[in-house]
UniProtKB/Swiss-Prot annotation:
This is OTU domain-containing protein 7B. Residues 440-452 have a biased composition (Polar residues). Residues 183-365 form the OTU domain. The lineage of its organism: Eukaryota, Metazoa, Chordata, Craniata, Vertebrata. Interacts with TRAF6. Interacts with PARK7, leading to inhibit deubiquitinase activity. Interacts with EGFR, ITCH and NEDD4. Interacts with TRAF3. Interacts with ZAP70 in activated T cells, but not in resting T cells. GO terms for cellular component: cytoplasm; nucleus. It comes from Mus musculus. The keyword Transferase does not apply. A motif (Nuclear localization signal) lies at residues 483-498. The modification Phosphothreonine is found at T730. The protein undergoes a significant conformation change upon binding to ubiquitinated substrates. The loop that precedes the active site is in an autoinhibitory conformation in the apoprotein. Ubiquitin binding leads to a conformation change; the loop is stabilized in a catalytically competent conformation with the result that the active site Cys can form the reaction state intermediate. A zinc finger (A20-type) spans 793-828. GO terms for biological process: adaptive immune response; in utero embryonic development; mucosal immune response; negative regulation of canonical NF-kappaB signal transduction; negative regulation of interleukin-8 production; negative regulation of protein localization to nucleus; negative regulation of TORC1 signaling; negative regulation of transcription by RNA polymerase II. Residues 531-541 have a biased composition (Gly residues).
Length: 840
């Protein structure tokens, strides 16, 4: 900050007693207009005094002022002029999108309220005492179609939604049971802190801008009482992964790895992006901080910070540009706060989505009074296989690393069986089985890697996954043939997991490596083992055993349906506890756990009539959330009306003032012109459901764009899928909007009826699909293009601006792109021609 701004901030803090962080937020929200910020401060204190504890109750050396003592401070208000600099404009832009950005002052009070509830990271207590909160979107179905589409593309991470739904990972349960609510990913800033942003959005509705969660995460890893237990769980899982790839760490290397994990969680920025970098909210900024990206272990630690389970919905494989899977994605699954007693934890899980190296919060939408839909999150995939339970094994303080790791007896004593995992889920969450109608069927998930089955965690503990399969495939009578079959199956699984682990370690090198890996290890990659249910190739003895067990379980399901839950739940397992499922210690689990085990086994054999889900508790909104949403909706309506007005102005410029008739470039559309024109009300909806995803970075804003360039921050760059590309293909990173106003009239890039590729007829500045692909780069300037006239459309002529040597086009009134932009700017400065005041 400059000296003047320091002085303004000091005066504001001295006159109000506000915390410096809150004072800065208020001043920045009003462009450093002190009078306006003071007015905001007084209004908020009076409105929210009964609901929010004063955010400046501690940590400030300035005396507190009475709640309604605004008149006492009136004479001390500074009479400085409004100060503004480029950084403040950037901050204002950054706070101009999304529900939490509608009123920075309200959110600042709420953030301060949250942070004031936290304790010291080094105390015996948890860094934060979290109330049970779950944010819900307002009911958008009450609004008109065009306005609803505008809000959806502003608030919802459309590309992530489409990608995960098409991959069969998200909302597949809605198609199986219409009483379940759809979950939607909220648009989240991609600055390296997206995990904590997503968690904060999912609970409170605003980003973790003050890094409250990140600081708590770091404190718990560095000096929390659970530090050593968390480290053992991490080292155990990492050791199993290292075994698969043949890696052996020394003690120094283990310490270095652990220190690196802690360092990643630090709240210190990694770097500052330049003017062409990707920053939160799509704003070019030289001061926007970027933080280190976090790993799956940090999700596990976050569950302990929040004292609540976390469920991450993600695809299981990373795919190259051709849709080929070449590396596993380890994030998907369940993270339980296992080092906190279940009685002290919230039982409603926080649900996050992960796609293309980016986290988002998954939230439901408010319902009408008459609606009976329930908010749930399945704990299995669409094939009824239990999701990975991450970092569930703690070998204990007495574990001798390097020695006990190779002792099969010791290993067998700590591997978790399916029964143990179900017991943990019942302990930490409110779970239930949702019955399905006879004709319902889950959409198939995307094809896995040639190695892994749908729910297997490629980087999770191999023994844990094998234990699941063992519990399902083995008879309750402990048949020897079944055990032999399981041993041979484990050998095959080990070979497959080895290939997966190698792909995981090296997969980031891209498509070429993935192709070579699969080519050179084809024997391993394509030798698929039996399904997780244990059905498939095997000895005659095991087949007979499976048939017997299958019949018994069918009877179990029928009796449960008839209401005899107690007898049916204990039936198949009460004859003899499953001794081959090690890790249960011989203890008998509750009736509910045994019922879940029986139903899970049946479901995993392809006869599932139920979905195993955790219930999501949706509490009442806090008053600050209600006001935050109402202000956002009012702000969104303003922007929507301004956008409609701008489209009308552009249409007049294009059709009335500059172009005498329909643009000739629109004529050769091969599909009968199915696309809507740019001013059609259907456009927001079409843009809202694009595919692919630009990753965890923000796409730079092209210069000179009008409101049509102001698409949501993480909108799809590549547009809808065309040609024969699969829906999960990764597209080049491009800006989603139209970089120049004339791009509305670009012909389709598919070959026309005459076989000529229409995009090839256009000069480079008019080619959208292949004009630029790097998300960090501004679109290339077209002004220097000087192609030969023989390649131009017949109507293209020299720019009509005197002394300009470039070519124009009828759609730009025969002006080159540079002169055309200058003409638009000139028109905007005329009365009635101003553009939107809001910029994303």
């Amino acid at each position: 900050m400059t000296l003047d701004m320091d002085a303004v901030l000091s005066d504001f803090v001295r006159s109000t007693g506000a915390e410096p962080g809150l004072a800065r937020d208020l001043l920045e929200g009003k462009n450093w207009d002190v009078s306006a910020a003071l007015s905001d401060f007084e209004q908020l204190r009076q409105v929210h005094a009964g609901n929010l504890s004063p955010p400046f109750s501690g940590g400030s050396t300035c005396p507190k002022t009475p709640e309604k003592g605004g008149s006492d401070r009136e004479p001390t208000r500074p009479s400085r002029p409004i100060l503004q600099r480029q950084d403040d404009v950037i901050q204002e832009k950054r706070l101009s999108r999304g529900i939490s950005h509608a009123s920075s002052s309200i959110v600042s009070l709420a953030r301060s309220h949250v942070s004031s509830n936290g304790g010291g990271g080094g105390s015996s207590e948890h860094p934060l005492e979290m109330p049970i909160c779950a944010f819900q979107l307002p009911d958008l179905t009450v609004y008109k179609e065009d306005f609803r589409s505008f809000i959806e593309r502003d608030l919802i991470e459309q590309s992530m939604l489409v990608a995960l739904e098409q991959a069969g990972r998200l909302n597949w349960w809605v198609s199986m049971d219409s009483t379940c609510q759809r979950l939607l990913p909220l648009a989240t800033t991609g600055d390296g802190n997206c995990l904590l942003h997503a968690a904060s959005l999912g609970m409170w509705g605003f980003h973790d801008r003050d890094l409250v969660l990140r600081k708590a995460l770091y404190a718990l890893m560095e000096k929390g009482v659970e530090k050593e237990a968390l480290r053992r769980r991490w080292r155990w899982q990492q050791t199993q992964q290292n075994k698969e790839s043949g890696l052996v760490y020394t003690e120094d290397e283990w310490q270095k790895e652990w220190n690196e994990l802690i360092k990643l969680a630090s709240s210190e920025p990694r770097m500052h992006l330049g003017s062409n970098g990707a920053s939160g909210g799509g704003v070019e900024s030289s001061e926007e901080p970027v933080y280190e990206s976090l790993e799956e272990f940090h999700v596990f630690v976050l569950a302990h910070v929040l004292k609540r389970p976390i469920v991450v919905v993600a695809d299981t494989m990373l795919r190259d540009s051709g849709g080929e899977a070449f590396a596993p994605i380890p994030f998907g699954g369940i993270y339980l706060p296992l080092e906190v007693p279940a009685s002290q934890c919230h039982r409603s899980p926080l649900v996050l989505a992960y796609d293309q190296a980016h986290f988002s919060a998954l939230v439901s939408m408010e319902q009408k009074e008459s609606a009976k839909e329930q908010a749930v999150i399945p704990l299995t995939d669409s094939e009824h296989k239990l999701l990975p339970l991450h970092f569930a094994v703690d070998p204990g303080k007495g574990w001798e690393w390097g020695k006990d790791d190779n002792d099969n007896v010791r290993l067998a004593s700590i591997i978790l069986s399916l029964e143990v995992k179900l017991h943990l889920l019942h302990s930490y969450m409110n779970v239930k089985w949702i019955p399905l109608s006879s004709d319902s069927q889950a959409p198939l998930a995307q094809p896995e890697s040639p190695t892994a089955s749908a729910g297997d965690e490629p980087r999770s503990t191999p023994e844990s996954g094998e234990s699941d399969k063992e519990s399902v495939g083995s008879s309750s009578l402990g048949n020897e043939g079944s055990r032999r079959k399981e041993k041979s199956k484990r050998d095959r699984e080990k070979d497959k997991k080895r290939a997966d682990s190698v792909a995981n370690k090296l997969g980031s090198f891209g498509k070429t490596l993935g192709s070579k890996l699969k080519k050179n290890m084809g024997g391993l990659m394509h030798s698929k083992g039996p399904k997780p249910g244990g059905l498939g190739s095997g000895s005659g003895i095991s087949s007979g055993t499976e048939t017997l067990e299958k019949k018994k379980k069918n009877n179990t399901l029928k009796s449960w349906k008839g209401g005899k839950e107690e007898a049916a739940g204990d039936g198949p397992v009460s004859e003899k506890p499953p001794s081959e499922s090690v890790g249960n210690g011989g203890s008998k689990y509750s009736q509910e756990v045994m019922q879940s085990l029986s139903t899970m086994r049946i479901a995993m054999q392809g006869e599932g009539k139920y979905i195993f889900v955790g219930t999501l508790k949706m509490g009442h909104r806090h008053q600050y959330q209600e006001e935050m949403i109402q202000r956002y909706l009012a702000d969104a309506e303003e922007r929507f009306l301004a956008e409609q007005k701008q489209k009308e102005v552009e249409r007049k410029i294009m059709n009335g003032g500059l172009v005498s008739g329909p643009p000739p470039a629109k004529k050769p559309e091969p599909d009968g012109g199915e696309d809507q024109p740019s001013d059609s009300p259907a456009e927001p909806k079409a843009m809202a459901f694009s595919t692919a995803y630009p990753g965890g970075f923000t796409i730079p804003r092209p210069s000179g764009g009008g409101v049509h360039c102001q698409e949501p921050r993480r909108q799809l760059a590549g547009g809808p899928c065309v040609g024969g590309l699969p829906s999960y293909a990764t597209f080049p990173r491009q800006y989603p909007g139209r970089p120049y106003p004339h791009q509305d009239n670009i012909p389709a890039l598919e070959p026309g009826k005459d076989g000529v590729h229409r995009g090839a007829l256009l000069p480079p500045q008019f080619r959208v699909a292949d004009s630029y692909s790097n998300g960090y780069r501004e679109p290339p300037e077209p002004d220097g293009w000087a192609g030969a006239p023989r390649g131009l459309p017949p109507t293209q002529t020299k720019c009509k601006q005197p002394n300009c040597s470039f070519y124009g086009h009828p759609e730009t009134n025969n002006l080159c792109s540079c002169c055309y932009r200058e003409e638009l700017r000139r028109r905007e400065r005329e009365p009635g021609g101003e553009l939107l005041a809001h910029r994303f």
